[in-house]
A protein has these predicted regions:
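Residue-level recognition of strand-loop junctions within catalytic nucleotide-signaling folds
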Residues: 75-76, 132, 333
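Short beta->alpha connector loops
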Residues: 106-109, 130-135, 252
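Active-site-adjacent beta->alpha loops and helix N-cap segments on the catalytic face
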Residues: 134-143
């Protein structure tokens, strides 16, 4: 048996030709649906191994009338934003008769790669993923195997993957401008880790609005976590005692920043106004209620699932990036700064 030529995508017909059998025989061997002779089975498995061939689970499931399984990888299930979006994605998949294999990577690239290997071995029909900062090789390998991949919240580096994201830069610029218009002048920004595309985009939106207003940018990195948000707020308060507003790049860092502000005895919004990215359920319950930049999570989740099913039905579709606008939920935390009694 001669070695197969190099191919980016292998079909069942290629395996059949190399093994000297029909495609139907290859299907029987790979699925174990009917017995074949040991000699034929060995030839088919050898050809499949040479090609690194993995049969389409989509086709097999459809023939058997079985439900599809889709892998969903989330980068931080404890983050209310991701929890809400994954819940909506799962509901949309369930409504389409699809089973979900859910994995939490906890922003760990090794875990992501390990889970993607599981997805490949389980022959999932598609993968929905909010990727870690790196680990793109494992995603590309999955795409090489013919598995459709749709990224959400953050795109992946491989241009063959679809993506459903928010317009992060425009949203943060909108929130920053709201504070400028309310009379704030010393507006700080608490951003996420620099390796994440969402963090870079939100920082760019802040800088654009601040520079347009002619103000000095005041930034600190909080790594999208509660403790990081607290440290970043403390840093900004120390470096800029006249700080009068904060734009915060996610809901977890907002919690930490609020802890730091209250520990310092700072009144909200009288002394420091706040606009935060993400609109968790507790935002409206705070006192003062939190002004937020809300992502349309339900619409984004539906777009993720619709794109995945379109890709599973037609693997030749060109990849797309679907970008959603965020909207301001204006509440008390962004009210204009109040002048002190007798002030000028």
């Amino acid at each position: 048996m001669n070695p197969p030529p190099h191919r980016m995508r292998v079909r069942i017909y290629d395996v059949a030709k190399l093994a000297g059998v029909s495609p139907a025989t290859v299907s029987r061997v790979m699925s174990g649906s009917r017995p074949v002779s040991e000699g034929i089975r060995a030839r088919v498995l050898d050809a499949a191994r040479r090609f690194d061939y993995q049969p389409s689970q989509l086709a097999r499931n459809l023939r058997r009338g079985q439900a599809a399984t889709v892998g969903v990888l989330v980068s931080d299930i404890e983050n209310p934003h991701f929890a809400s979006m994954v819940r909506a994605i799962e509901a949309a998949l369930y409504d389409r008769g699809t089973r979900v294999l859910l994995c939490n990577t906890a922003e760990d690239t090794q875990k992501q790669s390990s889970y993607l290997e599981v997805m490949a071995s389980e022959r999932v029909m598609g993968v929905v993923i909010s990727p870690t900062a790196d680990g793109d090789d494992a995603i590309s390998h999955l795409i090489d195997l013919g598995v459709p991949v749709v990224a959400f919240d953050r795109p992946v580096a491989d241009p063959r993957a679809d993506a459903v994201v928010a317009d992060n830069a425009a949203a943060i610029a909108l929130g920053t401008q709201l504070l400028v218009d309310s009379g704030r002048r010393r507006i700080g920004f608490i951003g996420g880790g620099e390796l994440l595309s969402t963090a870079a985009e939100r920082l760019a939106g802040y800088r654009s609005a601040i520079e347009s207003a002619g103000f000095e940018p005041l930034t600190a990195i909080g790594d999208f976590a509660v403790e990081g948000g607290r440290r970043a707020a403390e840093q900004l308060l120390t470096q800029s005692p006249d700080l009068d507003a904060l734009v915060i790049a996610n809901n977890l860092m907002t919690i930490g920043a609020l802890q730091a502000l209250r520990a310092s005895g700072i009144l909200l919004p009288e002394e420091v106004g706040i606009v935060a990215f993400d609109d968790p359920p507790w935002a409206s319950l705070l006192d003062p209620a939190l002004t937020t930049l809300a992502q349309p999570l339900r619409e984004m989740s539906e777009a993720v699932v619709e794109r995945l099913f379109a890709r599973m039905a037609d693997r030749t579709l060109p990849p797309v990036r679907i970008c959603f606008e965020c909207h301001l939920e204006i509440r008390q935390s962004s009210r204009g700064r109040m002048k002190s009694a007798g002030g000028g």
